[in-house]
Swiss-Prot record:
Protein name (database record): Bile salt-activated lipase
Glycosylation sites: N207
Biological classification of the source: Eukaryota, Metazoa, Chordata, Craniata, Vertebrata
Described function: Catalyzes the hydrolysis of a wide range of substrates including cholesteryl esters, phospholipids, lysophospholipids, di- and tri-acylglycerols, and fatty acid esters of hydroxy fatty acids (FAHFA). Preferentially hydrolyzes FAHFAs with the ester bond further away from the carboxylate. Unsaturated FAHFAs are hydrolyzed more quickly than saturated FAHFAs. Has an essential role in the complete digestion of dietary lipids and their intestinal absorption, along with the absorption of fat-soluble vitamins.
EC number: 3.1.1.13, 3.1.1.3, 3.1.1.6
Subcellular location: Secreted
Protein family: Belongs to the type-B carboxylesterase/lipase family.
Amino acid sequence: MGRLEVLFLGLTCCLAAACAAKLGAVYTEGGFVEGVNKKLSLLGGDSVDIFKGIPFATAKTLENPQRHPGWQGTLKATDFKKRCLQATITQDDTYGQEDCLYLNIWVPQGRKQVSHDLPVMVWIYGGAFLMGSGQGANFLKNYLYDGEEIATRGNVIVVTFNYRVGPLGFLSTGDANLPGNFGLRDQHMAIAWVKRNIAAFGGDPDNITIFGESAGAASVSLQTLSPYNKGLIRRAISQSGVALSPWAIQENPLFWAKTIAKKVGCPTEDTAKMAGCLKITDPRALTLAYRLPLKSQEYPIVHYLAFIPVVDGDFIPDDPINLYDNAADIDYLAGINDMDGHLFATVDVPAIDKAKQDVTEEDFYRLVSGHTVAKGLKGTQATFDIYTESWAQDPSQENMKKTVVAFETDILFLIPTEMALAQHRAHAKSAKTYSYLFSHPSRMPIYPKWMGADHADDLQYVFGKPFATPLGYRAQDRTVSKAMIAYWTNFAKSGDPNMGNSPVPTHWYPYTTENGNYLDINKKITSTSMKEHLREKFLKFWAVTFEMLPTVVGDHTPPEDDSEAAPVPPTDDSQGGPVPPTDDSQTTPVPPTDNSQAGDSVEAQMPGPIGF
């Protein structure tokens, strides 16, 4: 065999990620780990070291995670581990396993020497706190959260990891017997492991950025607010979710704990006995006890997201809005997709994506009432009025459907994100604040032509999929991906998305409450992409007009009489506009909040995984 043939075979070996990592065997607190090195071209040069499946913690069912005890010999870190136990998409079975707390690392390497002191980006996945994994969705071994493109294009270390989800990650009795937040504590353990060990991989332990999307973005926000992470995190990026999101904190965990306990045959009157029983129940039974009907639900879908973080007096010691002093020195970048609410609107108002089915005023009014229960009839009416102002001039179905999506986007994503940005800015000491809107239209061919960027549409661009799978994307998609990776990794390096090794298409100015600066990210990013005060009219409505209305329902409990109830919409033209209900049968119900309201009908409506 000739020398050229030998060389070719050797290069092919490395391109298949079968060569030993350039770092060699790396010593961690648990023992030695050895990954693989993947060459980025046949001619050699740059490469990436990849370590998959490194254990960072262990955990028993419904208990806090503990440090992993370590291993003997050298761990071959070459394959992703199974995700944490969760329901399948059909919710009639489970997959994954309880032994799931593993992380993955991508380290870019140059031609001559191994990397050192690189910024570190730690990814937290979304999935409604119900599903997901550190590697993400898989299509022909092409994993969504493969960190290679970010690492090599941005010259940063990328870390992803698993954390517990669903009842196993967030079931809580609301007291010390079962405090919950196990999934958040898993995340913290991964961040702390990175802090202690990443220097051995060439990373800078004093320059860690956590970033995430949806439930992962809310997790990022909550991690910056938790006193447990003091000194661990330098910067944070929240994509479509914050700690102040209406779906990020469960205010009534005991109700849902009792509901699950009843389903699996555990006592419910005493939380200590209930917790003890739940901890020894088959984890698969606990997981499958939570189920969601994805149609014909009585309330907006977010009301059914039961197993999510709680204020436990410890890891999350207070209402998140009171914890922003803890993030005063953490640079923060946050934003939303311009039609983030579309995914949820398709569940709440199924006609949204159906060309031959109309959205009616009644549909929208009922949706609004479900989201404005706390302010009763006046809140529902005021909200309905401001969002439907354009309908008189443009009663087209396109305009009406876009209004529904805009409303869900505002209340679930934009308003809480703007609140979080303002809180961060108000409490920041040395930290900087940046805001964005992602508006590159969805590539889903089944969506209406008016569709913008749906929930999670940004993920493929942040993780460089237009480069990893070029045949599936257009040149404009690669332009968007290149810009997002550049801004994100520059921010991780310096706290400024403009400053770093990667050139950017235009200068991104910091956010303040006075200027309302945000960068509009799409295929054409120019100086005109820097804009101010996103949807200012609606922000003012929610912050001023809506907030000034008297609260008639506290803590999501039902109204006591019809005068306070959220109304149902008109049913014919003679009514002219939405009117309040005239009897109990017309009142829009609110989700149950305590055991007195529990029953078979409630359990039949109980949700499972969707969206966030």
